[in-house]
Amino acid sequence: MRRRNFLLLSGSGLAAAGLAACGGSGGGGGESGGSEVEVFTWWAQGSEKAGLDALVEQFEKDYPDLTFVNGSVAGGAGSAAKDMLQSRLQAGDPPDTFQAHAGLELADYIDAGQLEDVSDLYDEYGLTEAFPSDLVELLTLDDKIYSVPSNIHRSNVVWTNVELLEAAGIDPSAVPSDVDAFIADVQKAADSGVTGLSIGTTWTQVNLLEAILMADLGSEAYNGLWTGETDWNGAEVTTAVGHFEQLIALTNTDRDGLDWTDATQMQIDGTAAYSVMGDWAVASFQQAEWEDGKDFGYFPLTGGEAIFGFLADSFTLPVGAPNPDGAKAWLDTISSQDGQLAFSLAKGSIPARTDVDTEEFPAYQQTAITSYAEDAISPSLAHGAATPVAWLNEISDATSKFTTGASDAAGYQEELATIAEKHASA
């Protein structure tokens, strides 16, 4: 029920909501008590840490009597943090608040009774009016809401090193019309003597897989993969798996030892032409003082349909949190106009609120704002919007087997289909 509700919304409702460019000021009342507030995230490095630092700065302005305690754990798009978090929750030792991806990633925590209902905060902080109505509906389960989004990201973005593309005879302003055309360009870049497509460990490979599936299947059929309405054994999935195999062959051989920051750094260092990564990568290019359009470029991986690969960072209130009032103060800051503006400017995302002044956002975020308002919306697999954690973990294991040579394309597709049959009917 949850899965179908999310995917029905993601096809059109969220896209219609958009973002307005109007002014406003942030929240922040004045919780006092001098208590520590442990905030558990996986934002431990690069632009992610820069985004967290921006939130902490705003939090300290909003609540000077509270002390932020950084519980960040690095690695694997949150996989290391989620493993540690699960151990703590099972041991009855929750942090005051923890980061999660909005969507079905939260289902396991909700089913285990590990999250408090924060619906009252939506009324207290005015969030029901500030967030798009369809986003609020997406976050609602049985008339309860269990997380507060801090921003919205796009997962299906191709990033380019303009100089390397030009050296390979590729027009950096031309957007490939489909995945076959993109593969041809990556091959051309590889033939010029650089890594065609830089990538990291398993979760970044799953991010590439989802981008290919979106492009090859289109939004409706891609969304159907998670509801049982699209056959994982179908010809379109076979095509997508073949494209994935071709692109993996054009990536760096040390990929399994790298994270996304390392893969992006390969482009900045001039050793890789392309990457496929969420739009948090833009902050890395900006921090390197690269100029948009001159040094780096970007476009969504497409098969013809304009699709926004959706994910949202959010924060929760765990059952048994040592300082629930401190956690609520953090939720106030991250959902405020000032908090969402500061965070998204630093992290490369766009605000979840519709009343944040977006005029000062750089060019990439402006394109994301437009796309989010106009394009089809599909939930990210790699980042918890499309499936519960258990399903994603099994896809990740199957993907690792495939990219390390332990299975072939046919076996990989068959395993993906078996995993889907197990979970889609659950």
Task: Describe the predicted segments one by one.
Residues S72-M84, G103, S177-I183, R255-I268:
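Short helix-initiation/N-cap motifs at beta->coil->alpha
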Residues L141-S150, N156, D180-E229, A272:
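Extracytoplasmic/periplasmic solute-binding protein
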Residues K61, A249-L250, Q287-S349, S407:
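Extracytoplasmic/periplasmic substrate-recognition and gating elements
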Residues R2-A107, A112, P172, F361, ...:
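Conserved N-terminal structural module of periplasmic/extracytoplasmic solute-binding proteins
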